[in-house]
Amino acid sequence: MTVLKNDRFLRALMRQPVDQTPVWMMRQAGRYLPEYRATRAQAGDFMGLCTNPERACEVTLQPLERYPLDAAILFSDILTIPDAMGLGLYFETGEGPKFKKTISTAADIEKLEVIKPLQDLPYVMDAVSTIRRELNGRVPLIGFSGSPWTLATYMVEGGSSKDFQKTKALIYNHPEAAAQLMDKLADSVIAYLNAQIDAGAQAVQIFDSWGGALSHDAYKTFSLAPMAKIVKGLKRENEGRKVPVILFTKGGGQWLEAMADAGADCLGLDWTTDIGQARARVGDKVALQGNMDPSILYASPDRIREEVARILASYGAGTGHVFNLGHGITPGVDPEHAGAFIRAVGELSAQYHK
């Protein structure tokens, strides 16, 4: 077992004392970095990066060379599971992910098989083990998956969607078939994340990008319940350490109390929820991750620092906070502004941990 030189991130997730608030950024390996764009050009396209463990490792580590981050996150895509189910993932420039096949009937769902990660997605596990080796204990590595609901939206719509009309029609017209789809996806996510943990992931995050589009009750049935099932099925210890789990529903602020009962160690917050109020609502059940608006990175470094100070003050003293953006960093951000954000967290947060 490699000794972790910096375990601040894992300690905060488990609400253990830390010397300062740990920080990382969703999509920290991404198009805002010129070195990422250069590696992606060499790979040919996005999937060429994802499916090559050495290149995936290279881009995973790039932000750590620039910034004093407290965690690395596996470079991959949330849609690897539907791709492994045979739907044929591809990317069109400027249009995002698309699938050659879609799911539209109960018969389509019946035919889907739960994935076998080592057989279907070996390149992901190879990337995890390669990154762990190269990190050599520098910081922990986060593995991840999309949530069943979020994966289902892409599988049914065939790509991105503004209103999820087809997926919502499925859950309302054919709730039993929709439940079967969520079950198969939950079982696939359990297998996928456990394989990542076996390969060396030291924490895992479930990205529920589109849960916030659901009604109050539909969220609990078709998004939260499958995620709770996943949390229950995950390996919670590896290499003698607990493997913490983060749940992140974009637009999920109204469900924090229910999410806190799902068994995860930490809840991710987007920027529409006040983190101080969120802390009061969940108490000491879970840690919180977030939640600066990524668009603030387009402001001046001084304004970025002010916003970091405001969020730290809102959360208040003590552990249980992982600083992050409220969603992924966007491609037009100046890398210097991202650096100002990371440095501000380090410089301003120690006073809250005395």
Curated annotation (Swiss-Prot):
Gene behind this protein: hemE
This protein's UniProt keywords: Cytoplasm, Decarboxylase, Lyase, Porphyrin biosynthesis
SUPFAM superfamilies in UniProt: UROD/MetE-like
Subunit architecture: Homodimer.
Binding residues for substrate: 27-31, 77, 154, 209, 327
Lineage: Bacteria, Pseudomonadati, Pseudomonadota, Gammaproteobacteria, Cellvibrionales
Name by which UniProt lists this protein: Uroporphyrinogen decarboxylase
Family: Belongs to the uroporphyrinogen decarboxylase family.
GO cellular component, one term: cytosol
Organism: Saccharophagus degradans (strain 2-40 / ATCC 43961 / DSM 17024)
Molecular function GO labels: uroporphyrinogen decarboxylase activity
Pathway: Porphyrin-containing compound metabolism; protoporphyrin-IX biosynthesis; coproporphyrinogen-III from 5-aminolevulinate: step 4/4
InterPro entries reported for this sequence: UROD/MetE-like_sf, Uroporphyrinogen_deCO2ase_HemE, Uroporphyrinogen_deCOase
UniProt-listed Gene3D superfamilies: 3.20.20.210
Localization in the cell: Cytoplasm
GO biological process: protoporphyrinogen IX biosynthetic process from glutamate
Site positions for Transition state stabilizer: 77
Catalytic reactions of this protein: uroporphyrinogen III + 4 H(+) = coproporphyrinogen III + 4 CO2
Enzyme Commission number(s): 4.1.1.37
Coarse class of the protein's main subcellular location: cytoplasm
Function: Catalyzes the decarboxylation of four acetate groups of uroporphyrinogen-III to yield coproporphyrinogen-III.
